[in-house]
């Protein structure tokens, strides 16, 4: 089947072929070929290889060897692992354990152990070794006598104790350390360990670190006590400043010359905070009229003599008016409302001199409302209506033409008589 990619069409008889069992018809089934008689012999030939091994047909999934390999992968791995080349050290260790195998006897009670040991003879077992570098001479076998064996029996029995002795770890006692000697030993050890030695800066750095690590406790306590003393002094100064914040000297009698001309500092007494608050003016602002005119009253010295006289005469009336206005519901007043002007419009005698406005028409009132600067005179030409002549007009009678001319003249007169009352800033005229 050819290879297909994304977007390629699949052909019916090329890419997808139906199996033969589905393509059989009734006529094909009528003519089935006969089964051969020597089928078994052919089957044996097919299932056997030239080497004598059995194999399956390719139709049934491949050879028997492939099937065995897939089913026994761990066994094949171990088989290959054993065939792998190994070093000579591994061979020596393996032979040592195989040669030194001793058969284990049955478990006997302790009473029968001693006669069995006497019967057995001590035999020397030669040890076979393979050296990698050069061969060495074989050591002579050591033969132990029976007398030596009997003497060692009671020693062996003493080894097997029912309860072993408790293990106690050694405890190191703390000893006072001299920092100078410790630094010297550390520098000597470092020089011995490092064949080439450390640089001068590294040795100095190690000495500084060791000196800071082994600081005596007496120095630290002295430093802490000094810090505490300075903190106490600072705290006491702050308390003294708070107590001496508001103090007033005692009033001394002027006749007492001793206290006036003495070199000592005068005696002080603390001041109550309530009295200070009463003396100091508050920074809050008020909306009453008195506060607004307090600044003006302070500026009387800057005014001239005439203005000061006028101001003093009107001060009472102004204060009374301010108090009355401050008690009103609004609670706010301006300078323009409170200050009385010297000349008022009502006092002027000009009402009779003002011209009286006469009643005029709507057109005149419109002209009066408009400003004179914006008025412009515009001349409009009357529209001229011309009668359009056509070919059909020649055939009409003269009476019809006269009637049309009369109607146009009447309409023209009406248009000329119309007065346009415009709201714009221009006057229309013929």
Curated annotation (Swiss-Prot):
| Subcellular location, record wording | Bud neck
- What are its GO cellular component terms? cellular bud neck; cytoplasm; nucleus
Residues found modified as Phosphoserine: 395
Q: What induces it?
A: Expressed periodically during cell division. Requires ACE2, CBK1, MOB2 and SWI5.
* Keyword hit for Phosphoprotein: yes
**What keywords appear on the UniProt entry?**
Cell cycle, Phosphoprotein
Q: What more does the record tell us? A: Present with 922 molecules/cell in log phase SD medium.
- What is this protein's function per UniProt? May be involved in the establishment of the daughter fate.
* Protein known as: Protein DSE3
């Amino acid at each position: 089947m050819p290879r297909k990619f994304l977007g390629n069409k699949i052909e019916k008889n090329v890419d997808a072929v139906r199996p033969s069992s589905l393509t059989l018809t009734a006529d094909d089934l009528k003519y089935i070929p006969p089964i051969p008689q020597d089928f078994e012999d052919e089957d044996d030939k097919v299932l056997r290889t030239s080497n004598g091994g059995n194999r399956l047909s390719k139709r049934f999934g491949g050879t028997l060897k492939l099937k065995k390999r897939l089913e026994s992968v761990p066994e094949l791995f171990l088989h290959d692992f054993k065939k792998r080349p190994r070093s000579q050290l591994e061979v020596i260790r393996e032979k040592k354990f195989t040669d030194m195998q001793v058969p284990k006897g049955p478990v006997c009670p302790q009473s029968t152990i001693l006669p069995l040991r006497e019967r057995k003879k001590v035999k020397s077992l030669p040890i076979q070794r393979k050296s990698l570098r050069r061969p060495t001479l074989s050591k002579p076998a050591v033969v132990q006598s029976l007398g030596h064996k009997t003497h060692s029996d009671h020693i062996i029995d003493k080894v097997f104790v029912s309860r072993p002795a408790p293990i106690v770890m050694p405890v190191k006692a703390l000893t006072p350390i001299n920092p100078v000697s410790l630094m010297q030993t550390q520098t000597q050890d470092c020089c011995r360990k490092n064949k080439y030695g450390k640089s001068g800066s590294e040795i100095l750095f190690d000495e500084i670190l060791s000196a800071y690590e082994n600081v005596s406790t007496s120095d630290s306590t002295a430093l802490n006590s000094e810090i505490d003393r300075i903190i106490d002094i600072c705290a006491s100064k702050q308390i003294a400043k708070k107590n001496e914040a508001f103090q007033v000297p005692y009033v001394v009698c002027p006749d007492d010359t001793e206290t006036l001309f003495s070199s000592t500092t005068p005696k002080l007494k603390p001041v109550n905070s309530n009295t200070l608050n009463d003396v100091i003016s508050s920074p809050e602002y008020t909306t009453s009229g008195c506060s607004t005119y307090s600044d003006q009253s302070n500026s009387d010295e800057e005014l001239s003599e005439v203005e000061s006289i006028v101001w003093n005469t009107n001060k009472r009336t102004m204060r009374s008016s301010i108090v009355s206005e401050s008690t009103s519901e609004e609670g706010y007043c301006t300078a323009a409302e409170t200050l009385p002007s010297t000349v008022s419009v009502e006092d002027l005698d000009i009402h009779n001199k003002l011209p009286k406005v006469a009643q005029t028409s709507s057109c005149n009132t419109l002209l009066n409302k408009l400003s004179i600067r914006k008025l412009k005179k515009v001349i409009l030409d009357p529209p001229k209506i011309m009668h359009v002549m056509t070919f059909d007009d020649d055939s009409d009678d003269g009476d019809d033409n006269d009637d049309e001319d009369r109607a146009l003249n009447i309409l023209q007169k009406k248009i000329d008589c119309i007065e346009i009352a415009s709201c714009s800033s221009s006057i229309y005229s013929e």
